[in-house]
Amino acid sequence: MANRGPAYGLSREVQQKIEKQYDADLEQILIQWITTQCRKDVGRPQPGRENFQNWLKDGTVLCELINALYPEGQAPVKKIQASTMAFKQMEQISQFLQAAERYGINTTDIFQTVDLWEGKNMACVQRTLMNLGGLAVARDDGLFSGDPNWFPKKSKENPRNFSDNQLQEGKNVIGLQMGTNRGASQAGMTGYGMPRQIL
């Protein structure tokens, strides 16, 4: 956690809630996928959130991962170098995030650089990597390595084509929101406040 002191009060409660969202089982799946997917040897961290964060913190593993999802020669991150300088590490994380967005990840699904670098929200980092893996499986371009069942299946577009005849017939059907013209009705019922007529 960089140069920040401990959180107290409400900030501490919020931080604890965020930390509870972190999934250790998902961490192992992501590590397995990243080590399988990357073309170069990126190592393997010990189990635990801090070890996972330190493994990804300099951005080199993330850049290798996004480059491995593109064909040879079309890698989005051209220069990957390990560095101990904070701004270089954060720059590489930013390059990964920009490349992930170009790959097709929604802006709302992408973590902030500080979430990873300061370890503020590692669950958000996991969600971004899960979305990236799911999108790589859905693309089905032969560049995904690993078990497709590791990631949730993305839905695919399934357009419907109706003929003009079918569209015209649909206009004749009374929608369920309108009620029905069959079954019990209020015919013969008296209004409120009127006496009941028994003959």
Curated annotation (Swiss-Prot):
GO terms for molecular function: actin filament binding; cadherin binding. SUPFAM superfamilies: Calponin-homology domain, CH-domain (SSF47576). Calponin-like repeats lie at residues 174-199. The modification Phosphoserine is found at residues 11, 163. InterPro entries: Calponin-like, Calponin_repeat, CH_dom, CH_dom_sf, SM22_calponin. It comes from the Eukaryota. One of its GO terms (biological process) is actin filament organization. The modification N-acetylalanine is found at residue 2. The modification N6-acetyllysine is found at residues 17, 20. Keywords: Acetylation, Isopeptide bond, Methylation, Phosphoprotein, Ubl conjugation. PANTHER family: CALPONIN, TRANSGELIN-2. This is Transgelin-2. It comes from Homo sapiens (Human).
